[in-house]
């Protein structure tokens, strides 16, 4: 188990471990996204909806809503940028934890959100922007980490690209390869393994959303601590490796 956790978020990457980690992170993104919606009626993991809502707000002269959306996008971009900085710094230092550190930071930020969420509700003017921006930053942090780790093969915080790729592969699978002018090596073939993988991600995002919604209704912000603990367990082994190595 310890070896598995070390390889899951460690420096040396294999497609097998990238895919396994993406399963955990997709569930986490779905849960955090749903929990955020239950808390303040906004989704924070996908920027498409936020950008569209900001454009609508600008069109009807709702400047506050427009600025809120713009700042949310900036928070997401900032999270992605900070993740890239951490990973590139870790690569420069040849750390085992170059990918684990952004996850560990995400874990700590989710824990802060879980512990302080109820307390922050008393500050109405501060509560919504602070929590929304924190979750947008967290989602940017996570999405950039798995994107860099997998060489842009996997993203976990939104499923638009996933269902698009599923449709593409289904279309390729259904293509009628009957043209005698083309040999079998040029036949169009769908990637069934990719379809299964992406369908798993979509299902886990949905299940994460279900768990996040139920968890928030049942226990409020404290439900976020489950996600924080999950990410902490995923990230801690490579970090401990680097700590032990630095003390030798």
Indicate where each model-derived feature is located:
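Alpha-helical transmembrane segments of multi-pass membrane proteins
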Residues: 2-248
């Amino acid at each position: 188990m310890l070896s598995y956790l070390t390889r899951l978020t460690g420096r040396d990457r294999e497609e097998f471990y990238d895919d396994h980690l993406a399963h955990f992170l997709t569930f986490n993104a779905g849960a955090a996204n749903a929990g955020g919606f239950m808390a303040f009626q906004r989704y924070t993991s996908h920027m498409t909806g936020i950008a569209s809502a900001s454009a609508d707000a600008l069109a009807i002269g709702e400047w506050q809503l427009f600025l809120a959306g713009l700042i949310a996008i900036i928070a997401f971009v900032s999270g992605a940028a900070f993740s890239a900085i951490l990973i590139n710094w870790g690569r420069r230092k040849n750390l085992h934890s170059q990918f684990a550190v952004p996850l560990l930071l995400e874990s700590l930020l989710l824990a802060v959100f879980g512990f302080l969420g109820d307390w922050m509700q008393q500050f109405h003017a501060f509560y919504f922007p602070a929590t929304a921006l924190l979750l947008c930053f967290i989602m940017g942090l996570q999405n950039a980490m798995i994107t860099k780790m997998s060489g842009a093969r996997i993203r976990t915080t939104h499923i638009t690209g996933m269902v698009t790729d599923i449709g593409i592969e289904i279309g390729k699978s259904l293509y009628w390869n009957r043209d005698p002018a083309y040999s079998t090596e040029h036949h169009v073939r769908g990637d069934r393994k990719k379809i299964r993988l992406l369908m798993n991600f979509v299902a886990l995002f949905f299940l994460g959303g279900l768990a996040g919604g139920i968890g928030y209704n049942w226990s409020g912000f404290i439900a976020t601590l489950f996600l924080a603990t999950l990410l902490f367990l995923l990230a801690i082994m490579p970090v401990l490796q680097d700590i032990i190595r630095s003390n030798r």
